[in-house]
Amino acid sequence: MFSLQDLCRKNTFFLPNDFSKHTLQRLGLYWKEHGSVHRIEKDSIMIQNELVLSINDALQLAGEEGDTDVVQLLLLWEGNLHYAIIGALKTENYNLVCEYHSQIQDWHILLPLIQDPETFEKCHDLSLGCDLICLLQHAVKCDMLSILVKYKEDLLNVRIRHRTQSLFVLACENRRFEIIEWIGQNLSIPEPEAIFSIAIVTKDVELFSLGYKIIFDYMQRQGIFQLTNVVRMLLLNRHIGMAIEKGLLPFILETLKYGGSVKRALSYAVIDNKRKIIDYLVRHENIPRGTIERLLHLAVKKQSSRKTLNLLLSYINYKVKNVKKLLEHVVKYNSTLVIRILLEKKKNLLDATLTRYVKDSTYFQVKEFMQDFSISPEKFIKIAVREKRNVLIKGISEDIWENPAERIRNLKQIVCTIKYESGRQFLINIIHTIYQSYSLKPEEILKLATFYVKHNATTHFKDLCKYLWLNRGTESKKLFLECLEIADEKEFPDIKSIVSEYINYLFTAGAITKEEIMQVYALEYAMY
């Protein structure tokens, strides 16, 4: 038989305003004390053409009122029966509950949908065979702290006190922080350490920190905070070891906030070859030089990896006497690896140390280091270019090469050895500032111009061209032709454009012929 309810279930539309209450009742689209009801979307209804509710909210309301007709209608519209039963339980409309009881296989499924603790408990009571512990477990899962508070005395009872541990673990696994804190303040937890293991496995720093709050608050309430300092440090050190093993830096930092030993953390990190942790702690915890040396000795003793040893070595300025002191330790533990690093890779060690000097030290400190280790100017300047320390480059190069022309010649040679473009341009900029600060001989300026062309230093080349044209005029003809040839060969269009402009000036001044231009690049300048 044709059913209007079926039609409404398949379609969304507005009811005509002229439908009477009697008509709506006959159609089954009238909700007592609310008015007309119709479906407007897949999961929404409208009451009296005004109020919009989700189907499940409407089901819960209908369940509270015990209106089985509306419940049936909303179920036709794909509502969730669980909400109707929750509503019925709230107002104790057990007739409706009994009507649909057989359709519920497991009453625990409804519990996460319930916000009211009384209704929560009523629903759980329908699960035959379940006890108080089952109720408390689901209360923890669903974050129903008020239920645990209600049964606090039962939890303190010696008969079920041992179940506190399982509730505590369950709360930790489900991140129920309020419940965890309440248990810590009100109940006795046999093994509170479980919170830290769970936090590390799940990488939950917030849970990890809460564990310390629970334990240390308990110690303070009991007046044993100072008496158990040794136990406290053992606890912190154990957690540092757990965090180091998993490589969890945020957990280590959290432990340090509660009094953990940074030296212990570094020792564990050295043994486990956790280089990122070592590097972070050394840089952010102001670790003394002596401590780093002891860590290096520990790394030798524990046969740490090459990368760990190299990292520790890079923090220290190792002059000859320091290396000899270290060798005494490595020989004692027969660490051939570190011997190979120091003897075979000494160059790399110096590079790493020099890089740190260039990055963080003053001109005088860098100069002293270069003298102590006979560091070549070229090596220093290439590192300084990488770190963008132009002041150091100018100072050291001026100190080594007093003559500006010699300084520029040596810096130009270094430019040719730098493999990355940004580094070459950085050093070329420094060369140009030297040129601007001194009066160079014409032949040096001409060499500098061709150097700029070869490295596509457009701005600096343009600056030199202006100087050459103003001061040498047509005497620069040979230079411009040479620069044109280089620019064309290397395909530097901006340089070619600049050179072409000055060749045009030369041509206009009669200082250059069409034939001379075409000898260089006939096709490019056939227009002449």
Swiss-Prot record:
It comes from the Viruses. Keywords: ANK repeat, Host cytoplasm, Repeat. Its main location: host cell. ANK repeats lie at residues 54-83, 129-158, 261-290, 292-321, 322-352. The keyword Repeat applies. Interacts with host STING1. Interacts with host JAK1; this interaction leads to JAK1 degradation. Interacts with host JAK2; this interaction leads to JAK2 degradation. Interacts with host RELA; this interaction inhibits NF-kappa-B promoter activity. It is found in: Host cytoplasm. This is Protein MGF 505-7R. Induction: Expressed in the early phase of the viral replicative cycle. Belongs to the asfivirus MGF 505 family.
